[in-house]
Amino acid sequence: FANGARYIAGNRCDKPLKKESPTAQYNLYDYKKELLASYKPCTGPRGTIGIPMGLNMFELYPFWYTFFTKLGFGVFHSPESDRKLYFRGQHTIPSDTVCYPAKLLHGHVEALVEAGVDNIFYPCMPYNFDEGKSDNNYNCPVVAYYPELLAANVPDLKKVRYLNPYFGLHRPRDFAKRAEA
Protein backbone atom coordinates (compact mmCIF):
# COMPACT_ATOMS: atom_id res chain seq x y z
CA PHE A 1 0.00 0.00 0.00
CA ALA A 2 1.05 3.59 -0.54
CA ASN A 3 1.22 4.25 3.21
CA GLY A 4 3.65 1.31 3.78
CA ALA A 5 1.10 -1.06 5.29
CA ARG A 6 1.12 -4.70 4.15
CA TYR A 7 -1.71 -7.12 3.61
CA ILE A 8 -1.00 -10.85 3.75
CA ALA A 9 -3.78 -13.19 2.61
CA GLY A 10 -4.07 -16.96 2.35
CA ASN A 11 -1.32 -17.59 4.89
CA ARG A 12 1.26 -17.84 2.09
CA CYS A 13 3.94 -15.91 3.88
CA ASP A 14 7.25 -17.66 4.53
CA LYS A 15 7.11 -16.62 8.15
CA PRO A 16 4.28 -17.63 10.45
CA LEU A 17 1.75 -14.94 11.27
CA LYS A 18 2.06 -15.74 14.96
CA LYS A 19 5.27 -14.98 16.81
CA GLU A 20 5.02 -18.15 18.92
CA SER A 21 7.60 -20.94 18.72
CA PRO A 22 6.33 -24.05 16.99
CA THR A 23 5.70 -27.00 19.28
CA ALA A 24 7.71 -30.13 18.73
CA GLN A 25 5.77 -32.70 16.76
CA TYR A 26 5.99 -36.38 17.57
CA ASN A 27 8.10 -38.07 14.89
CA LEU A 28 6.68 -41.54 14.31
CA TYR A 29 9.53 -42.46 11.96
CA ASP A 30 12.15 -41.74 14.66
CA TYR A 31 10.07 -43.64 17.21
CA LYS A 32 9.96 -46.71 14.97
CA LYS A 33 13.72 -46.57 14.35
CA GLU A 34 14.35 -46.33 18.11
CA LEU A 35 11.97 -49.22 18.78
CA LEU A 36 13.67 -51.45 16.21
CA ALA A 37 17.11 -50.49 17.56
CA SER A 38 16.01 -51.59 21.04
CA TYR A 39 15.87 -55.21 19.81
CA LYS A 40 19.57 -56.00 20.12
CA PRO A 41 21.20 -58.88 18.24
CA CYS A 42 21.49 -61.83 20.60
CA THR A 43 22.70 -65.41 20.75
CA GLY A 44 20.68 -68.47 21.67
CA PRO A 45 21.32 -72.13 22.39
CA ARG A 46 19.47 -73.22 19.23
CA GLY A 47 21.53 -71.12 16.80
CA THR A 48 20.94 -67.79 15.09
CA ILE A 49 18.09 -66.60 12.92
CA GLY A 50 18.88 -63.80 10.49
CA ILE A 51 16.01 -61.54 9.46
CA PRO A 52 16.33 -59.29 6.38
CA MET A 53 15.10 -55.80 7.23
CA GLY A 54 13.04 -54.98 4.19
CA LEU A 55 9.45 -54.75 3.02
CA ASN A 56 7.03 -56.12 5.65
CA MET A 57 9.76 -57.21 8.08
CA PHE A 58 10.06 -53.70 9.53
CA GLU A 59 6.51 -53.89 10.85
CA LEU A 60 6.82 -57.50 11.97
CA TYR A 61 10.35 -57.52 13.40
CA PRO A 62 9.26 -57.10 17.05
CA PHE A 63 6.89 -60.06 16.63
CA TRP A 64 9.46 -62.33 14.98
CA TYR A 65 12.23 -61.28 17.39
CA THR A 66 10.07 -62.23 20.37
CA PHE A 67 8.85 -65.42 18.70
CA PHE A 68 12.35 -66.74 17.99
CA THR A 69 14.02 -65.63 21.22
CA LYS A 70 11.27 -67.35 23.23
CA LEU A 71 12.03 -70.52 21.24
CA GLY A 72 15.72 -70.30 22.20
CA PHE A 73 17.18 -68.78 19.05
CA GLY A 74 19.46 -65.81 18.79
CA VAL A 75 18.17 -63.16 16.40
CA PHE A 76 20.25 -60.96 14.11
CA HIS A 77 18.94 -58.51 11.53
CA SER A 78 20.52 -57.21 8.37
CA PRO A 79 22.08 -53.72 8.32
CA GLU A 80 20.26 -50.54 7.44
CA SER A 81 19.52 -50.11 3.74
CA ASP A 82 21.90 -47.98 1.70
CA ARG A 83 23.36 -47.84 -1.79
CA LYS A 84 26.27 -50.11 -0.87
CA LEU A 85 23.84 -52.79 0.35
CA TYR A 86 21.89 -52.50 -2.90
CA PHE A 87 25.04 -53.09 -4.96
CA ARG A 88 25.99 -56.07 -2.78
CA GLY A 89 22.99 -58.01 -4.07
CA GLN A 90 22.46 -56.39 -7.47
CA HIS A 91 23.98 -59.30 -9.41
CA THR A 92 21.15 -61.61 -8.28
CA ILE A 93 18.20 -59.40 -9.31
CA PRO A 94 16.42 -61.18 -12.19
CA SER A 95 14.21 -58.31 -13.33
CA ASP A 96 14.66 -54.58 -13.42
CA THR A 97 10.90 -54.03 -13.17
CA VAL A 98 10.49 -54.91 -9.49
CA CYS A 99 10.33 -52.07 -6.94
CA TYR A 100 13.52 -50.72 -5.35
CA PRO A 101 12.63 -51.93 -1.82
CA ALA A 102 12.40 -55.48 -3.17
CA LYS A 103 15.73 -55.11 -4.98
CA LEU A 104 17.31 -54.09 -1.68
CA LEU A 105 16.37 -57.45 -0.18
CA HIS A 106 19.00 -59.16 -2.32
CA GLY A 107 21.67 -57.16 -0.50
CA HIS A 108 20.03 -57.81 2.86
CA VAL A 109 20.18 -61.60 2.48
CA GLU A 110 23.74 -61.43 1.11
CA ALA A 111 24.73 -59.42 4.21
CA LEU A 112 23.13 -62.00 6.51
CA VAL A 113 24.97 -64.85 4.78
CA GLU A 114 28.26 -62.94 5.11
CA ALA A 115 27.49 -62.29 8.80
CA GLY A 116 27.50 -66.05 9.37
CA VAL A 117 23.97 -66.63 10.67
CA ASP A 118 22.80 -70.25 10.85
CA ASN A 119 19.36 -69.58 9.36
CA ILE A 120 17.68 -66.83 7.39
CA PHE A 121 13.97 -66.45 8.02
CA TYR A 122 11.84 -64.63 5.48
CA PRO A 123 8.30 -66.04 5.27
CA CYS A 124 5.88 -65.83 2.36
CA MET A 125 2.91 -63.93 3.74
CA PRO A 126 -0.08 -63.46 1.42
CA TYR A 127 -2.07 -61.96 4.31
CA ASN A 128 -1.14 -59.67 7.15
CA PHE A 129 -2.76 -58.90 10.49
CA ASP A 130 -6.46 -58.15 10.20
CA GLU A 131 -6.88 -54.76 11.84
CA GLY A 132 -10.61 -54.70 11.13
CA LYS A 133 -10.32 -51.46 9.17
CA SER A 134 -10.74 -52.77 5.63
CA ASP A 135 -12.40 -55.46 3.57
CA ASN A 136 -9.17 -57.42 3.17
CA ASN A 137 -5.66 -57.64 4.53
CA TYR A 138 -3.75 -58.86 1.50
CA ASN A 139 -0.09 -58.06 1.11
CA CYS A 140 1.22 -56.74 -2.19
CA PRO A 141 2.21 -59.75 -4.37
CA VAL A 142 5.85 -58.67 -4.24
CA VAL A 143 5.77 -58.50 -0.44
CA ALA A 144 3.85 -61.77 -0.21
CA TYR A 145 6.00 -63.96 -2.44
CA TYR A 146 9.42 -62.32 -2.80
CA PRO A 147 11.01 -64.92 -0.50
CA GLU A 148 10.42 -67.48 -3.28
CA LEU A 149 12.18 -65.27 -5.81
CA LEU A 150 15.15 -64.86 -3.47
CA ALA A 151 15.36 -68.64 -2.99
CA ALA A 152 15.54 -69.14 -6.75
CA ASN A 153 17.99 -66.32 -7.54
CA VAL A 154 20.45 -65.85 -4.67
CA PRO A 155 22.98 -68.71 -4.87
CA ASP A 156 24.56 -67.78 -1.52
CA LEU A 157 21.34 -68.77 0.26
CA LYS A 158 22.47 -72.37 -0.22
CA LYS A 159 25.23 -71.66 2.34
CA VAL A 160 22.66 -71.29 5.14
CA ARG A 161 19.32 -72.80 6.05
CA TYR A 162 16.79 -70.56 4.32
CA LEU A 163 13.36 -70.66 5.92
CA ASN A 164 10.57 -69.22 3.80
CA PRO A 165 7.39 -70.92 5.01
CA TYR A 166 3.93 -69.71 4.08
CA PHE A 167 2.40 -67.92 7.06
CA GLY A 168 -0.74 -65.90 7.43
CA LEU A 169 -0.95 -63.86 10.59
CA HIS A 170 -4.58 -63.06 9.92
CA ARG A 171 -5.75 -66.31 11.56
CA PRO A 172 -3.91 -67.01 14.84
CA ARG A 173 -5.07 -70.65 15.09
CA ASP A 174 -3.73 -71.44 11.64
CA PHE A 175 -0.49 -69.66 12.46
CA ALA A 176 0.04 -71.84 15.53
CA LYS A 177 -0.52 -74.99 13.45
CA ARG A 178 1.85 -73.81 10.69
CA ALA A 179 4.51 -72.84 13.22
CA GLU A 180 4.48 -76.34 14.70
CA ALA A 181 5.18 -77.93 11.33
Task: Place the predicted regions along the sequence by residue.
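An N-terminal assembly and electron-transfer interface module characteristic of large anaerobic redox
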Residues: 1-181
